């Protein structure tokens, strides 16, 4: 419930732009959010393994 409330709180436009922070669009996690995708590293990894994100694949060398 708390995470849901924080997601709603993050959607509101703050009075000052410096108070804005990124939050994952899928799970609501506030840390390690990739700006390009708008999702956290955990969700990004999961979606990449499923092949849901076009052009993104796991690196191997």
Curated annotation (Swiss-Prot):
Co-factor remark: Binds 1 zinc ion per subunit.
The answer to whether keyword RNA-binding applies is yes
Q: Which Pfam families match?
A: Ribosomal_S14
Q: Which UniProt keywords apply?
A: Metal-binding, Ribonucleoprotein, Ribosomal protein, RNA-binding, rRNA-binding, Zinc
> Which residues participate in Zn(2+) binding?
24, 27, 40, 43
| Alphabetized SUPFAM superfamilies for the sequence | Glucocorticoid receptor-like (DNA-binding domain)
Cofactor(s) required for function per UniProt: Zn(2+)
Q: The organism sits in which domain of life?
A: Bacteria
Q: Which GO terms describe its cellular component?
A: cytoplasm; small ribosomal subunit
Extract the signal peptide range: none
Q: Provide a GO biological process annotation.
A: translation
Q: Name one GO molecular function term.
A: zinc ion binding
Q: Does the keyword Hydrolase apply?
A: no
Q: What does the sequence similarity comment in the record state about its family?
A: Belongs to the universal ribosomal protein uS14 family. Zinc-binding uS14 subfamily.
| Oligomer and partners | Part of the 30S ribosomal subunit. Contacts proteins S3 and S10.
Q: Which NCBIfam families match?
A: PRK08061.1 (NF005974)
Name the job this protein performs. Answer: Binds 16S rRNA, required for the assembly of 30S particles and may also be responsible for determining the conformation of the 16S rRNA at the A site.
Designated name of the protein? Small ribosomal subunit protein uS14
What's the source species for this entry?
Coprothermobacter proteolyticus (strain ATCC 35245 / DSM 5265 / OCM 4 / BT)
Gene this chain is encoded by: rpsZ
């Amino acid at each position: 419930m708390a995470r849901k409330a924080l997601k709603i709180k993050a959607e509101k436009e703050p009075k000052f732009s410096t108070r804005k922070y990124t939050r994952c669009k899928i799970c609501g996690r506030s840390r390690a959010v990739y700006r390009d995708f708008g999702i956290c590293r955990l969700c990004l990894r999961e979606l990449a393994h499923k092949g849901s994100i076009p052009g993104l694949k796991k690196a191997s060398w």
